[in-house]
């Protein structure tokens, strides 16, 4: 599992997805896709040809999402606080 710190992310790296249930904007121009919605509907919501950076406040949900999306062949990186 690839990981980076939140402070090291910049928008040129790829698409930032916040999987928290609240709609707070941690990063400008980020996507907010709730955890369960992304797990169930990833084929409709994201594109395998793009690079994604997955974040949540606690880290548990984002870690699960990254593991699952890696399994399905997505280019994802876990973003930690």
Give the positions of each predicted feature.
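Flexible, polar/low-complexity N-terminal or interdomain linker segments that lie immediately upstream
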Residues: 1-27, 35
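Catalytic cysteine-centered active loop of the rhodanese-like fold, especially the PTP/DSP P-loop
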Residues: 42-81
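Charged/polar, solvent-exposed surface patches and flexible loops
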Residues: 8-11, 40, 44
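A short alpha/beta connector and helix-capping loop motif
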Residues: 27-38, 53
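Glycine-rich nucleotide phosphate-binding loop and flanking beta-alpha elements
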Residues: 23-27, 39, 60-62
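Conserved beta-strand segments of alpha/beta enzyme cores
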Residues: 15, 29-31, 75-78
């Amino acid at each position: 599992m690839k990981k980076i710190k939140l402070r090291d992310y910049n928008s040129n790296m790829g698409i930032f997805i916040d999987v928290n249930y609240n709609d707070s904007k941690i990063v400008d121009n980020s996507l907010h896709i709730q955890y369960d919605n992304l797990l169930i509907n990833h084929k409709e919501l994201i594109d395998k040809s793009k690079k994604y950076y997955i974040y949540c406040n606690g880290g548990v949900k984002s870690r699960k999402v990254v593991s699952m999306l890696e399994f399905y062949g997505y280019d994802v990186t876990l973003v930690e606080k």
